[in-house]
Amino acid sequence: MSAPITLPPVLERYELKYMIPIEYVEPITDFISLYCSLDYHSETAKADNYFYSVNSLYFDTPRYEFLKQRIAGQAHRVNMRARTYGDGSKPPYFLEIKQRMGIPGVVRKYRATVADEEWPSLLTDPNFRIADTDSAKERANKELFLRLAISNAIEPKILTKYQRRAFFSTVDEYVRVTMDANMQYRKQDDYALVSTYGMTNYDNETIYAVNTASDANVVLEIKCNIGEVPQWVLSLVNLFELKQQAFSKYATSTLVSHVDNGDWFMSSDRKSRHSFS
């Protein structure tokens, strides 16, 4: 069994996203098995077909400035979230900032580990102080998260949950492949990192389709060092005729759940027949 892969506190990488039907999951798994191994979380989720739960609580300003920047296609923007894995009942939890760098596909990711006794007091207690036991990089990332949280007056907005099968390359310095399925969301105004009720399944024709109905309901993401896309990744894209597509779980969930059922930003043939109330 592989050891847990620990992401560095700051990671700058190139991210490629594709929408695929669930039927592609196993063939793609077979293809990349020559170059990749399951990550620790997937390897320990054999009973669930190597899919594990990812729970993310997304934050935004009171007037949704992060979302507005995303919709406007602003080149330099940030996304802030707290994340936990599995059932979310125990730490570690993670604070994450994803910063778009002005270059298509290039993302800088800041991450800090949060202990049980720190959550959610680090965001709700004005007297909270970062522990001296944190490493210098962890401390710097927590301080950055808190500065942005205070200056933007961030609030919990959306909780998402999905099942992920993840891989890491065994032949490259850094390549990570993830496939996210069974995605759910709910509006959230507190700091709970998981929910057992009120989660809405992503509706296929509303969420995933582009201008028409689609069988795509899984998000495939390939992450690698900038300027180092391996040949096997290009072969994967060509073999399965994958088309790169932007997809934001936060933006999609928020638009559909908060803004007129998403009608104002979707073309008429993408409107859902289902209720998102």
Model-derived segments and spans:
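Phosphate-end processing signature that detects enzymes handling 5′-triphosphorylated RNA
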Residues: 1-277
